[in-house]
């Protein structure tokens, strides 16, 4: 698709359609705090292994991902920091580090028309990792991603590279 054919609203709809098969989605119309949050997606998985009967459990593991989708005309460093901090704080409230918790990902995703160099640099260099009880109760990573309409680009931080393929499919389909 050529440069900037899809609007941010169309990209948001395509993204939510891609997430809806696996994630619980909560949409936001307009917020009192003027945060450009459009949707919050939650993913939960519980796995366990047992022998013969469920009482003879060998292990169990909980995995979670919390995606916060923001939409802005221009992504600046200030907007990035404000939204990233919000996603981190809200995501940490949802994490329950306990025996059996393996990992949780907090993923702020930005849909924007343009992105400043400072914001791009901050997004790509974002590294937030937290281990709970020396990783006995799991860990948390922050994955960041931005879908930039100008130039049909997708950028992520190192931990968010797994999301890049999904985002590129959304942008180019």
At which residue positions do the language-model features occur?
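Short, surface-exposed beta-edge/turn micro-motifs
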Residues: 63-66, 103-107, 142
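Arginine/glycine-rich "motif VI" loop of SF2 helicases in the C-terminal RecA-like domain
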Residues: 96-102, 128-132
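Nucleic-acid nuclease catalytic cores
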Residues: 98-123
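Charged, structured surface patches that assemble and position nucleic-acid processing machinery
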Residues: 125-173
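Short, charged beta->alpha transition segments
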Residues: 53-56, 91-96
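N-terminal, charge-rich interaction modules
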Residues: 1-72
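Active-site-adjacent loop/helix micro-motif of nuclease/hydrolase catalytic cores
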Residues: 75-89, 93, 117-121
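Structural motif
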Residues: 69-74, 110-113
